[in-house]
Amino acid sequence: MNIRYESCLTERYVQSFINNIAFPKSLEELRYFIDEHGCYNVENILFEDETNWTCPKWAKVGDIVFFMHSKTAKATITKLRTCLNSSRCDYSDSEFEEMMSWINRGLELYKRYGGKIFAVGVVAGLPEYFDDQKETIYHWNSPIYCDIVNVVKLRNPIHISKFNSFITVSRQSGITPVFGEEFDKLKCLISKKNTIPEFLRLSISSSLPLSKKQ
């Protein structure tokens, strides 16, 4: 990663967004994650301090990213378990057991993080466009990515029920912009339950960009 973000110890104006991480939508995609990634997207954020991740095209260096595990993931997990059981004869014993183990692991992740903001990070590079995204089977379709660093896991993740009265998490996109009073309230909510990192404590929400649409 070509990191271009330098932290500072003074208050700064930022934009921010929630990155809502979903679950693989099909058995084919689940198989792809097993073979090519070795972990779920949520685990990638949990285990790494920096990453290259989807972002809005208006993201700037220093902006704040709130990582959330999709509330709807449980329904997807249940559907995949049903599909796997119904197509049992299509898999060898070892492959079936491996895929079922992954589904069960996904359910455990959901029980702990589902519908919750569980980590926060900082945009470290300008958005970049990858036009080969259409060739993949990923459950997300955004071709825009940026480097994200200083990923901090929250000791006490924040459930959507605590902030959906003032933030409407997008159902059409994995990205939900968070600005102005929304940012202030979410930051306050997180800080009541967690020791927040310095970069979040010193962040002040900037004005709304030209469009809230990614």
What is each model feature region?
Residues C83, R88-C188:
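Aromatic- and Lys/Arg-enriched surface recognition patch
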